[in-house]
C-alpha cells in the first residue's frame, strides 16, 4: 500500500511546485527575456490553463488505458517542458513552456486522485487526502525558500532544472514503483454499474460545487494576500512572509490532525465545521476592529479549508469505482476554472481585495452548508476495487 501513497503524493506535488518555485526568479527572468514582470505574471494563468486542458482528456484515458499510461507521459512532458522553459530566449517561448508544464502536471494530478480512489476505502481515503492537503500546504512555503537558496549561487534557469529533476523522480516512481490500479475492464454484468456512475449524480455535483467554492476561497486569499497584508494592513515584506509561513503552519497542523478527528467524528461533521469556520472568518473580517482580529480571521480561513477539503474530495470520488479518472478530471477542471473565473470577474467588476475575500467566504459557507445538509449520498458503491496488475 505504501507504494501507492508515495507515488500519489509525488504525482500531486508537481502541481504546486510548478506554481511556486519560479516566482522568486520572476524579476530576473523578466530582465533576461526583455519582458516586464506584469507580462510574465500571466505565466501563472497559462500554467493553470495547461492543467485544465490536460484534465479534459487525462481522466478518460486513465479509465480506458490505465493510470500508468497517463502518469508516465505526464511526468515526461513536465520534464521536457521544464527544460524548454530554462532554454527559452523570449517570453513567448517561456509561456509556451509553462503551458506544457501545466499539461504534464495536470495529467499527474488526475492520476494521483484516481489511484487513491482505486486503492482506499472511504474512511482511509478521507484521512490520506487530508494528509495530502497538509503536505501540499508545505510547498508554497518551501518552494520559494528553495528557489531563493538556489538563486544565491545559480541563474534562474536552475529553478527549472530543479523542477525537471523533480519530474525525473516522479517518472522513475511511475515506471518502476507504481503498479497499475485501474479496475479490470467492465464485463456485461458490470455495465449497469458503469452506467450508474453518472457525472450528473446530485451528490457528486454537490461535492463539485463545495470543493470548487473552497478552492476559490483559498486562491482568493492567496491572490489578495499581498494587498490585504502589505497595502491595507501596512505590514513590511518580511512580516508578510512570516505571516504567510504561519498560515501555512496552521494549515499543516489542522490537515495532519484531521485523520485523527475522522476517527472520532463523522465526515459530515467535519465538513460542516469547515464551512462554519469559513462563515466565522467572513464575519470576523467584515467587522474586524483591529489587525490582530483580522489575522485571527485569516487563520480561520486556513483551518476551515484544511479540515474539510480532503473529506469533501473523498466523498466526491466515492461513487466512482469504474470512472475514477473522469471524476477526478471533472473535479480538477471545475476547481481550476471556477476559482479563476471568480477572481477574474471580481477584478473586472472592481470589487476590492477585502470585499472579494469576504464575499467568497460568506457565499461558500452558505451554499456549502445547504448542500451538505440537504444532498445526501445515494446508494453506496464498492468502496474500492481489488487491484489488478496488468501486463
Swiss-Prot record:
Annotated localization: Cell inner membrane
Name of the protein this chain belongs to: Multidrug resistance protein MdtL
Cited NCBIfam families: PRK10473.1
Alphabetic keyword roster: Antibiotic resistance, Cell inner membrane, Cell membrane, Membrane, Transmembrane, Transmembrane helix, Transport
Stated role: Confers resistance to chloramphenicol.
PROSITE patterns: MFS
Organism of origin: Escherichia coli O17:K52:H18 (strain UMN026 / ExPEC)
TM region(s), chain numbering: 4-24, 42-62, 69-89, 93-113, 131-151, 158-178, 203-222, 245-265, 269-289, 293-313, 331-351, 356-376
Keyword Transmembrane: yes
GO cellular component: plasma membrane
GO terms of molecular function: transmembrane transporter activity
Main location per the UniProt record: membrane
